[in-house]
Amino acid sequence: MIAALILGLITGSFTGVICYRIPRNESIIFPGSKCDRCAVKIAFYRNIPVFSFLLQHGKCHRCGIKIKRSYFILEILTPVLFLILYFSHGFSIIFFYKAFVYSILLTASFIDIETHIIPDRFFIILLTTGFLYSVLRDNPENWFLGAASYGLPVLLLYSASDFINKEIIGFG
């Protein structure tokens, strides 16, 4: 249980980084976190999920600018979600699969709320993950059924979009 909580805290914090950096076309790995206003590098001990936000009253320790509450919400939601998954599935392949998928969905949702765009990479990651999970878990008939149930509507949307020369649904 403690491991699921810690994994959720770390994942929630990293999800916040992804939500900030992907819309700005920045690397999600380097450089380390910094303040938007004063550009001070955030030391590891000031970057502890949830606790740092609370101890610093949701502000940069140097310049006092408020840190977006959405990052704090992510840092709370993700470990709660991981604990629910842990109590439902234990540390199993299903736990890790669902934790990954839900983390991607949370990330896409928060980016969508901020920018009104869901980058294509999230659809690709979810499709690939779902396919791999299906291959490892299900029988071949389900692979084709899954591919057809996703592929046919997407093919129809792209075809209709080409036919009327207008984007029907945003694909990022």
Regions found by a protein language model. Give the residues of each.
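Hydrophobic, lipid-facing residues on alpha-helical transmembrane segments of integral membrane proteins
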Residues: 6, 10, 14, 76-84, ...
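Long, highly hydrophobic alpha-helical transmembrane signal-anchor segments
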Residues: 1-23
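Membrane-proximal soluble regions of multi-pass membrane proteins
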Residues: 15-71
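Hydrophobic alpha-helical transmembrane segments and immediately flanking/interface helices
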Residues: 69-78, 95-98, 167
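Hydrophobic, membrane-inserted alpha-helices
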Residues: 55-58, 77-85, 103-106, 126-132
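Functional transmembrane core segments of multi-pass inner-membrane proteins
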Residues: 95, 100-172
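Transmembrane helix-loop-helix
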Residues: 86-97
